[in-house]
Regions:
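Conserved alpha/beta enzyme-core scaffold
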Residues: 6-455
Length: 455
């Protein structure tokens, strides 16, 4: 970022500027350390999810050791920062990733706030952090493009920018793409709302591509059979959704649309294969719609100033009523386990958090609003625990399990042994259909359990 449009404030005087004093003019350009010094020992800080993390700023905050009670609201931190291991720093996370799981394992105070992605915005508004910090790209007009993440924080960033009692800090990263907003919406933070700018140079996080197994490929092949040539797609994270996209990219025909909370490398592959036209969508036609993106550096480069992909707030992208208006909509997500009632566990193991609900339930619910649409929940039939094969399809969920998606939203479950279409089926019928796609080792006992299932 050039300093010609920023007011440079030295560390000797910036502490004495009132919050909001610089509003309406160019934002102050500070060093990361000076920006970090603007937070009080007891304070509240809000962060954007994942690719919106301001890495340089978080590293600068990590260098401070005078915290008394710093409360942080965020989700899916992409990196390990010493800040979060400080005993006086308390992190309220709406979604767990590898960093949150690691922090929990080393005794850091990281607490889950159970909420779907759409609920993050009201949760953050209630939290009302005094300081909001975000990583952005600088656009051609000198304003701040939220790049790979709009999500649930955009409105809170603007509120912080308009409030003279609050502080809005933007970290500019030259490696981030400038992305396009969905028509009728904005994903740009005006420069006059920003209090402080710092310069970052962190390489953009690339999501490692999971290696697909033969089981994953079989599941993906079965799932692809449910997808209409003019389908609008949503895919979650993981090897199986990526494999589904690859199957679609390689098979004959296909004029697909994209309406997906997360834009992934798999969806980019579909674009690259010429299989995405967005011409058959009944809402937001002509563009792929998303609210955040994680993938490869090549995907990010492709997204730069590319109008083929449009970003919008999560309350638009994840609205089930809007999702359901797409013709032949197919939602493809994973799960950890499912019981014979069709209850889905997708974000925890025995009550221990490993990820979050995200938009899982929104897209499952949206897909059920039209008989031409379908939600596919894909998972391997078994998992090995300490060398012992266990079924992921169980008669009942273990004590302490947390249901991510209730049975009344469940449509189709796919394993390597087939697909169980539960739509319109009775409790007993659903149970037997699920038993039939379990591993053969467990089918008899599951069918027996299905006979005795309460209904």
């Amino acid at each position: 970022m050039s300093t010609e449009n920023a007011v440079v404030i030295s560390s000797s005087c910036h502490r004495y500027l009132k919050v909001g004093q610089n509003r309406g003019v160019s934002p102050r350009l500070l060093s990361p350390a000076d920006a970090a010094a603007l937070l009080r020992p007891t304070d509240t800080l809000g962060l954007g999810l994942g690719p919106a993390n301001p890495h340089t700023f978080l590293n600068a905050l990590s260098a401070r050791d005078d915290w008394e009670n710093l409360q942080i609201g965020g989700a899916l931190v992409l990196g390990l920062f010493g800040l979060f291991t400080n005993p006086h720093v308390h992190y309220r996370a709406g979604f767990f990733g590898p960093a949150e799981r690691y922090l929990r394992s080393v005794g850091a105070d990281v607490q889950l706030v159970p909420a779907g992605f759409r609920q993050f915005e009201p949760v953050l508004r209630q939290f009302a952090p005094r300081v909001m910090a975000v990583q952005c790209a600088r656009d051609a007009d000198g304003n701040f493009n939220t790049s790979l993440h709009v999500g649930a924080t955009f409105e809170e960033l603007l509120r912080a920018g308009r409030d003279p009692e609050r502080l809005l800090i933007v970290e500019v990263n030259p490696h981030l793409p400038v992305t396009t907003a969905l028509e009728g919406y904005t994903t740009t933070i005006p420069a006059e709302l920003v209090d402080v700018v710092i310069e970052g140079d962190q390489p953009v996080f690339e999501l490692p591509e999971e290696t697909a197994t033969e089981v994953d490929e079989t599941i993906a092949d079965i799932a692809a059979g449910f997808i209409h040539p003019h389908a609008t797609l949503q895919t979650g994270i993981g090897a199986i959704p990526t494999m589904v996209a690859r199957h679609l990219a390689q098979r004959e025909g296909g004029e697909y649309g994209i309406h997906s909370e997360m834009f992934t490398t798999g969806l980019w592959m579909l674009h690259q294969a010429g299989k995405v036209t967005n011409s058959h969508k009944s809402i937001f036609p002509g563009v792929s719609v998303t609210t955040f993106a994680l993938g490869s550096s090549a995907m990010y480069e492709w997204m730069n100033n590319n109008p083929a992909v449009a970003f919008a707030p999560v309350d638009i992208v994840n609205d089930p009523t809007l999702i359901g208006r797409n013709r032949h909509f197919v939602s493809i997500n994973g799960a950890i386990s499912v019981d014979l009632y069709g209850q889905i566990v997708a974000d925890s193991v025995a009550g221990r958090q490993i990820s979050g609900v995200g938009g899982h339930e929104d897209f499952v619910a949206g897909a059920e609003l039209d008989t031409q649409n379908v939600s596919l929940i894909c998972l391997p039939a078994t998992i090995e625990v300490n060398g012992v094969r266990q079924s992921r399809i169980t008669a009942q969920l273990p004590l302490g399990s947390i249901v991510s998606t209730p049975r009344h939203h469940t449509a189709v479950i796919v394993t390597e042994f087939g697909a169980a279409d539960l739509r319109g089926r009775t409790v007993s019928e659903r149970a037997h259909l699920l038993a039939e796609i379990a591993h053969p080792q467990f089918r008899d006992e599951l069918h027996l359990a299905a006979e005795n299932l309460a209904h």
